[in-house]
Amino acid sequence: PYPMSWEEQSILFAELPDHLRRMALYKVNSGSREQEVVKLRWDWEIPIPELNTSVFLIPADFGGRHESSGVKNGDERLVVLNNVAKSVIEGQRGLDPVWVFPYGQPDQNGKATPVHRMNDSAWKKARVRAAKKFQERFMRPAPAGFASIRVHDLKHTFGRRLRAAGVTEEDRKALLGHKNGSITSHYSAAELGKLIDEANRISATDS
């Protein structure tokens, strides 16, 4: 795993094509798995009017590309949105009635589809350019982990930033979707508000 620094993130994200940058920004601020991003659906969104926001609830039976790539441990997965993740979601509204990130090739009926994965040739090319930019800026080679940064490292980055910001292990587990038992859908608005506050703490930390 390679958690990125904020400087590395800004270098990498500047090299990503717009649709990938939106998904990556959402992923590094929500701790979602790759398939939970590319196949995110509007009908999974649940408004929380008391907090003037919404959350996403990934169904327990969501399998992603193949059965092992969706929700881990067979439970629903709650995704809370910090301010950055929320702004990404708001920017996607109205693009498509089904998919939050409708960036795949249109199907035979001309309807939007999701991409299969974020870790595609565009990601890999951006990674090469980012490593070169890193070397130009800091006059030393990019760390090996950054030069070969994987999409999954965005989730590790989120987890590391939560820890650096002093978020408790219990709340980190809830935010990363590691919590066992399908109690995630039974949070009160106050508990959700606390989780959102915790997720917002990462905006001012670096590690």
Identify the residue ranges that each predicted region occupies:
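Conserved tyrosine-mediated DNA breakage-rejoining catalytic core shared by Y-recombinases
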Residues: P3-I11, S30, K39-G91
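Catalytic-site neighborhood detector that most strongly recognizes the C-terminal catalytic loop/helix
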Residues: F62-R65, K86, D107, A165, ...
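Active-site/catalytic core of tyrosine-dependent DNA strand-transfer enzymes
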Residues: E7, V80-F146
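Basic, Lys/Arg- and aromatic-enriched nucleic-acid-binding interface segment
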Residues: P1-L40, L95, K155
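C-terminal catalytic core of tyrosine-transesterase DNA break-rejoin enzymes
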Residues: R22-L25, N29-E36, D153-K179, H186
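Hydrophobic (often cysteine-bearing) scaffold residues that line and stabilize catalytic clefts
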Residues: H19-L20, L81, V115, N119, ...
